[in-house]
């Protein structure tokens, strides 16, 4: 099991898929990393040599922001939006969808479980 950027890659998967377990690296980025490092995409993680691992680490450190650094940058960007007081920051603060999606129905993932509102009872005559 190879450990790259603080993440244990699953040893039975191909390296092109294994690299996507790192936050900030998708399939295309993974393919580009392997191309720069000169490693075949079909190699399994368990078959990687130490030189291959070192080459992958070097390419990732030079060219990509991954894991903790990327997470903290994303959180700082969201915090900046909230501090500035813009519309997107307001939506983040309220826990609502940010990119213009409808909220009359749906948006359950962002809003959370329904909060039932009690009806006022009508006065009887």
Swiss-Prot record:
Region: Disordered, residue numbers: 95-125
PROSITE patterns: RIBOSOMAL_S13_1, RIBOSOMAL_S13_2
Source superkingdom: Bacteria
Ranges of biased composition (kind: Basic residues): 105-125
Gene3D superfamilies per the UniProt record, alphabetical: 1.10.8.50, 30s ribosomal protein s13, domain 2 (4.10.910.10)
Pfam families in UniProt: Ribosomal_S13
InterPro entries: Rbsml_uS13_C, Ribosomal_uS13, Ribosomal_uS13-like_H2TH, Ribosomal_uS13_bac-type, Ribosomal_uS13_CS
GO BP annotation list: translation
GO cellular component: cytosol; small ribosomal subunit
Keywords recorded for this protein, A-Z: Ribonucleoprotein, Ribosomal protein, RNA-binding, rRNA-binding, tRNA-binding
Gene Ontology MF terms: rRNA binding; structural constituent of ribosome; tRNA binding
Description of how the protein assembles with itself and partners: Part of the 30S ribosomal subunit. Forms a loose heterodimer with protein S19. Forms two bridges to the 50S subunit in the 70S ribosome.
Known role: Located at the top of the head of the 30S subunit, it contacts several helices of the 16S rRNA. In the 70S ribosome it contacts the 23S rRNA (bridge B1a) and protein L5 of the 50S subunit (bridge B1b), connecting the 2 subunits; these bridges are implicated in subunit movement. Contacts the tRNAs in the A and P-sites.
Protein family membership: Belongs to the universal ribosomal protein uS13 family.
Record protein name field: Small ribosomal subunit protein uS13
Gene name per UniProt: rpsM
